[in-house]
A protein has these predicted regions:
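N-terminal signal peptide c-region/cleavage motif recognized by signal peptidases
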Residues: 29-31
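Positively charged n-region of N-terminal signal peptides that target proteins for export
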Residues: 2, 16-19
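Short acidic-glycine-tyrosine-enriched beta hairpin
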Residues: 102-117, 225-239
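Conserved short histidine dyad/triad with adjacent acidic residue
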Residues: 63-82, 189-204
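A short, N-terminal "cap"/entry segment at the start of jelly-roll beta-barrel domains
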Residues: 33-67, 71-78, 109, 128-131, ...
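Histidine-centered metal-chelating micro-motifs
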Residues: 75-77, 81, 95, 112-113, ...
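Ligand-binding loop in jelly-roll beta-barrel domains
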Residues: 118-142, 239-261
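Short, conserved beta-strand element in jelly-roll/cupin
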Residues: 81-96, 192-193, 204-219
Length: 261
């Protein structure tokens, strides 16, 4: 009888140890894959395995910005699958041949590609030197594929087809303001800011924002700090953080302003 009781206790203890080990492993896995909050700062352009930034915000549970250099004669293909991330691309240095869901496009610097989950896009470099693109990955805890598809299909926007509206500080190209799979609103415009001018006094707004400099040299107010931003760099701005940008160069600065909520 004592032997049976001893065996039972031993088996029970062994099972409890397995449960504890499994629980600890699962907890560590959750911590490993949890996305850290993206910090408000200027992130430098770079290519390779390391992303410019990789984390989460108030809306996106995952937001990653990567730089890709595509060598002459090479191509890159993207398809995250029906349940995968939503992707957004900007041509940093082109031109580059783009095939979106089987339709061909020839896109140069400043052009964009928006890719819904499950669709295909291929970037092909037909030049001898490298071309460069940004890739932004977006995921949400509450994705809505029907919402994204109802707003429209995956698309490209050619820089040379974008409408430019001049104003007293330079001008603006309003690309789109629409619903997407990962967010009820995704808004992008491109600002041209004349030399020596500021975009506006430092201000705040609830929406998070990315300022991505495709041509120029500026200084950004980000909360209590001032940080330099040059061609290729991107600033990620948290909700309600005072910010603005001043053009430090003797030529116009051109940058993307990307917001979502």
């Amino acid at each position: 009888m004592k032997g049976l009781r001893s065996n039972f206790v031993h088996r029970h203890q062994s099972q409890m140890k397995k449960i504890i080990v499994t629980t600890v492993f699962l907890f560590q896995t959750v911590l490993l894959f949890a996305q850290a909050q993206i910090q408000t700062k200027v992130y430098k352009w770079g290519t390779g395995k390391t992303a410019m930034f990789d984390g989460a915000g108030a809306i996106f549970s995952k937001q990653v910005l990567k730089g890709h250099a595509i060598a002459g004669g090479k191509k890159l293909k993207f398809n995250t699958g029906v349940g995968g991330d939503e992707l957004f691309f900007i041509i940093k240095y082109g031109p580059v041949h783009v095939e979106l869901n089987g339709v061909s496009h020839h896109l140069d610097k400043g052009s964009v590609v928006f890719l819904l989950p499950g669709d295909d896009v291929v970037f092909q470099n037909k030049r001898k030197d490298d071309v460069e693109i940004y890739e932004m990955q977006m995921a949400s805890a509450q994705p809505d594929l029907a919402r994204g598809k109802a707003a429209g299909t995956s698309f490209v926007m050619d820089w040379f087809d974008m409408s430019f509206k001049p104003h007293d500080r330079g001008g603006v190209r309003q690309l789109f303001d629409r619903k997407i799979v990962m967010s009820p609103r995704f808004d992008i415009h491109i600002t041209t800011l004349n030399p020596g001018l500021s975009s506006h006094p430092p201000h705040t707004h609830k929406t998070e924002e990315i300022i991505l400099m495709i041509d120029g040299e500026g200084e950004m107010v980000l909360g209590t700090s001032k940080q330099k931003i040059i061609t290729g760099d991107a600033a990620w701005v948290e909700s309600n953080i005072p910010h603005n940008i001043t053009n430090l160069a003797k030529r116009p600065a051109v940058y993307f302003a990307i917001q979502w909520n």
